[in-house]
């Protein structure tokens, strides 16, 4: 879900904005105004709060079950072996912890950590104090020794050469060493017996005491290590024994050593022995194996003599992989099951099986959300990497913005909007001194036209938008890509539906609005009425104290056009429009079409940078190099700056109108982004297809008989295609639905005719024609191809075709009423009624109803109708008659009502 305002959330849940604001406050979120945005995280928190408030608990436990089957050979009592299927079932439960319990555990862990740190600090202080006392004691001993050495009378030159050193060892242990100084070697005849002095004796005693203390500490340390090794060995044995029991042992991390203590030493010794045997070549027991090993050793010796190193020594030829390959799986917000399986290098059915165990039924082409996909990836032993759908495009846009520089003033982009036939194109023709309106089919604009005009006040770029109701998307794109909106209103016609829609588009885009009241040259012009109607839509003129500039003009005579251009230039100066001139070009696709001999032709409006011939352009889902560039007059140009519309050639397909384009330098990056957008669009289409399939299923359950009008549609440009598709979808009713089998841009081809023939569809062309092959195919198949140049005609013909598919409407018409005055018996008909016709005409062969006390009690046919004993076919008002009702006995006072059912054709 995207970020939404409080007002949008209220509209989604059909509640008032104040109620949604109160719910946000109850959920613990800060108070928001109606126009403030609510982030996705806050929306999820609000939904969680509402679920809990309605008594719905969050699902905290997910159980996963797996089953593996293997075959084992077992020897029976008779000595024969047989195969036995061994089935191992495992169950794994993922339980989401309770937030309260998590908070308690976290607090307990923090308290334990604080206590541990306090104990560690206290131990460190005790060790420091002990070390200090030991050093002081050793220093005192050394001082006493030095004092005794100075006062000794038996000191001689040999004793003076004694050097005393204090060595402080690690752990606070201090030893005193007494060493004689080195003397030059002299030749002596005989060695005199060495006499131990008092200082040497004292030093020896201190050294012996210290060595004894060290031996005690070492003995204690060895004993402690032996006990710890024994504990680790027992624990390791318990873990190894647990693998052969039904209950799984405690999980051990992959990075822990295989074994410790006695077991680890034994395993290590075994591995070392195997490595030594491999090196010596004694691991092969058979003669054949010994022969191969001998030959291999001879080759190794020969290679060593030649200065080569054998790559086969001290290792096996083949090592079976013992660890599973773990992938880092990138998961977007929506991903299909097949794509997820491909990224994990497994088959799609493995993922679907795991989904079924989790309670999700999904096919390979179905999409799953990011959370479910992450759980699947973790269960299969891989690392999920959540990726945002817009990360690639955001990085691309950031890189493009960093390369932009040299900001300069750019021309304004002005969009002309208004109701159909209010003079928008005529106004542009007068400004450009052209005659575009006279060449438009039906006299109305059906495409977005882009022009840049050099006026006395500078260059201005104009966008001409259609005014027909079907082109709402085009007008919305025009308002988004523009700087200023000029709203054209006819002075003799006033506000119309598309005029109000244009005002809404301008407000939604936050674009300044300038009103041009056109057709002031007509006698029926009433500008005050237009001002009143605009004020009702909160568009107040500056003349009436508002902030909307208005100009009274005449596109026919040219009056007021200079004033309008002056208002546009003034508004552009106030906006201070700027754009970087250097760097890669960025902009928006205005329109795209497919021309024979030229290929895809794309009309673009440059917003930043400079577009040059040869640039690599990425537009929507397609990319390619610009082979040629032309302006609106068809003249070849080499470059186009900001706010300049151009037509480019070189893209492989026609991009969607309204999509943004960007110039890149790296073709690999362009291909990556294009593939990403293509995959995203494919996922969206799959979602729409699933939704349509579900919707059609419900429709078939609710409605037993629905007719479909199949259509194959081809248009000249993408904008017209979007407008027609939207208009045709709006024509669908509960009884007749429009189904567009295929649509595209370009001329009608043979494949279109074949598709229309196989699907029994109507083939329609809007401003395009069929090629020679398609015409021959249509003649052979006796298929009619309809061509249109005005959108009115196409929509009207589709409505007529849908009306012909509607079931006729049945209506009852009362033809006559007769009162039963008397009932008598007839030997031929039984009960017969004498009646007076009080209204209309009574017909013998029409259905009748018998009314008693103004309630229908019988519906059937007349068996006989007579007047004066003669059989007649009808009796008019004011005449008496006798009649007999087939299968029913009437009574005096009843009314006989004659009616007929008429059929009426229905229309859309």
Swiss-Prot record:
Region entry G4, spans: 518-521
Highest rank taxon of the organism: Bacteria
GO molecular-function terms, A-Z: GTP binding; GTPase activity; translation initiation factor activity
Places the protein is found: Cytoplasm
Region of interest: Disordered: 52-229, 241-316
Region called G1, residue ranges: 418-425
Basic and acidic residues bias locations: 94-108, 120-138, 176-185, 193-229, 270-280, 294-303
Annotated residues for binding of GTP: 418-425, 464-468, 518-521
Region (G5): 554-556
Limits of the tr-type G domain: 409-578
GO CC annotations, alphabetized: cytosol
Region (G3): 464-467
Chain segments carrying region G2: 443-447
Family per record: Belongs to the TRAFAC class translation factor GTPase superfamily. Classic translation factor GTPase family. IF-2 subfamily.
PANTHER family named in the record: TR-TYPE G DOMAIN-CONTAINING PROTEIN (PTHR43381:SF5), TRANSLATION INITIATION FACTOR IF-2-RELATED (PTHR43381)
Function text: One of the essential components for the initiation of protein synthesis. Protects formylmethionyl-tRNA from spontaneous hydrolysis and promotes its binding to the 30S ribosomal subunits. Also involved in the hydrolysis of GTP during the formation of the 70S ribosomal complex.
Name of the molecule in the record: Translation initiation factor IF-2
Source species: Psychrobacter arcticus (strain DSM 17307 / VKM B-2377 / 273-4)
Underlying gene: infB
């Amino acid at each position: 879900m995207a970020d939404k305002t409080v007002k949008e959330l209220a509209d989604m849940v059909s509640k008032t904005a104040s109620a949604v604001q109160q719910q946000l406050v109850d959920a613990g979120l800060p108070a928001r105004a109606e126009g403030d945005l609510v982030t996705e995280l806050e929306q999820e928190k609000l939904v969680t709060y509402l679920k809990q408030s309605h008594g719905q608990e969050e699902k905290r436990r997910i159980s996963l079950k797996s089953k593996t089957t293997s075959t084992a050979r077992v020897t029976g009592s008779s000595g024969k072996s047989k195969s036995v299927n061994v089935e191992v079932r495992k169950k794994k439960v993922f339980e989401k912890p309770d937030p309260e319990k998590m908070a308690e555990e976290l607090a307990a862990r923090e308290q334990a950590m604080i206590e541990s740190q306090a104990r560690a600090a206290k131990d460190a202080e005790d060790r420091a104090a002990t070390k200090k006392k030991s050093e002081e004691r050793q220093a005192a001993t050394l001082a006493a020794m030095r004092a005794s050495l100075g006062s000794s009378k038996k000191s001689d030159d040999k004793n003076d050469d004694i050097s005393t050193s204090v060595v402080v060892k690690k752990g606070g242990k201090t030893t005193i060493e007494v060493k004689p100084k080195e003397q030059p070697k002299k030749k002596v005849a005989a060695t005199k017996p060495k006499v131990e002095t008092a200082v040497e004796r004292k030093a020896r005693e201190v050294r012996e005491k210290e060595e004894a203390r060290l031996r005690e500490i070492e003995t204690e340390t060895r004993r402690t290590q032996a006990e710890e090794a024994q504990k680790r060995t027992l624990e390791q044995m318990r873990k190894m024994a647990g693998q052969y029991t039904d209950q799984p042992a405690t999980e051990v991390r992959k990075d822990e050593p295989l074994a410790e203590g006695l077991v680890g030493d034994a395993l290590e010794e075994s591995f070392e022995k195997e490595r030594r045997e491999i090196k010596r070549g004694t691991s092969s027991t058979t003669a054949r194996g010994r022969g191969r090993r001998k030959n291999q050793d001879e080759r190794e010796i020969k290679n060593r003599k030649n200065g080569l190193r054998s790559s086969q020594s001290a290792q096996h030829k083949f090592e079976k992989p013992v660890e599973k390959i773990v992938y880092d799986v990138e998961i977007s917000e929506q991903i299909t099951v097949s794509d997820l399986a491909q990224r994990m290098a497994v088959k799609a059915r493995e993922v679907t099986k795991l989904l079924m165990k989790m309670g999700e039924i999904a096919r390979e082409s179905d999409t799953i959300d990011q959370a479910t996909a992450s759980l699947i990836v973790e269960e299969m032993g891989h690392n999920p990497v959540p990726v945002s759908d817009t990360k690639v495009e955001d990085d691309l846009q950031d890189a493009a913005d960093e390369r932009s520089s040299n900001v300069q003033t750019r021309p304004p982009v002005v969009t002309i909007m208004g109701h159909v036939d209010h003079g928008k194109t005529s106004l542009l023709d007068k400004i450009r001194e052209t005659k575009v309106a006279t060449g438009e089919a039906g006299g109305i604009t059906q495409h977005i036209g882009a022009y840049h005009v050099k006026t006395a006040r500078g260059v201005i770029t104009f966008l001409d938008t259609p005014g027909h109701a079907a082109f709402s998307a085009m007008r919305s794109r025009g308002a988004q890509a523009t700087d200023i909106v000029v709203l054209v209103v006819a002075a003799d016609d006033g506000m119309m539906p598309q005029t109000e829609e244009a005002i809404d588009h301008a407000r939604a885009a936050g674009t300044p609005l300038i009103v041009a009241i056109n057709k002031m040259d007509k006698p029926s012009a009433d500008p005050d009425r237009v001002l009143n109607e605009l004020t009702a839509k909160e568009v107040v003129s500056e003349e009436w104290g508002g902030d909307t500039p208005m100009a009274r003009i005449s596109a026919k005579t040219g009056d007021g056009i200079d004033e309008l251009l002056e208002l546009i230039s003034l508004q552009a100066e106030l906006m201070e429009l700027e754009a970087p001139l250097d760097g890669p070009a960025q902009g928006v696709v205005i329109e795209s079409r497919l021309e024979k001999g030229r290929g895809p032709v794309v009309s673009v409006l440059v917003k930043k940078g400079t577009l040059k011939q040869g640039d690599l352009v990425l537009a929507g889902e397609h990319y390619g190099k610009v082979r040629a560039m032309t302006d609106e007059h068809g003249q070849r140009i080499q470059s186009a700056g900001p706010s300049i519309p151009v037509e480019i050639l070189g893209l492989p397909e026609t991009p969607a109108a309204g999509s943004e384009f960007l110039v890149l330098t790296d073709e690999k990056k362009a291909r990556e982004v294009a593939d990403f957008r293509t995959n995203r669009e494919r996922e969206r289409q799959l979602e729409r297809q699933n939704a349509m399939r579900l919707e059609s299923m419900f429709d078939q359950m609710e409605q037993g008989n629905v007719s479909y009008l199949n259509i194959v549609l081809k248009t000249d440009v993408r904008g017209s295609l979007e407008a027609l598709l939207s208009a045709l979808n709006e024509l669908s009713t509960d009884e007749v639905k429009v189904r567009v089998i295929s649509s595209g841009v370009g001329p009608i081809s043979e494949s279109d005719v074949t598709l229309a023939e196989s699907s029994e569809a109507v083939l329609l062309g809007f401003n395009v024609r069929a090629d020679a092959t398609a015409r021959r195919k249509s003649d052979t198949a006796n298929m009619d191809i309809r061509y249109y140049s005005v959108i009115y005609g196409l929509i009207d013909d589709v409505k007529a075709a849908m009306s012909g598919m509607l079931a006729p409407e049945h209506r009852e018409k009362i033809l006559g009423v007769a009162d039963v005055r008397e009932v008598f018996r007839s030997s031929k008909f039984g009960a017969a009624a004498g009646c007076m016709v009080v209204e209309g005409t009574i017909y013998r062969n029409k259905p009748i109803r018998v009314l008693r006390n103004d309630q229908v009690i019988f519906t059937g046919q007349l068996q006989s109708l007579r007047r004066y004993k003669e059989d007649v076919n009808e009796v008019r008002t004011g005449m008496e008659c006798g009649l007999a009702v087939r299968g029913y006995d009437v009574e005096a006072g009843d009314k006989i009502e004659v009616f007929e059912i008429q059929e009426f054709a229905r229309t859309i």
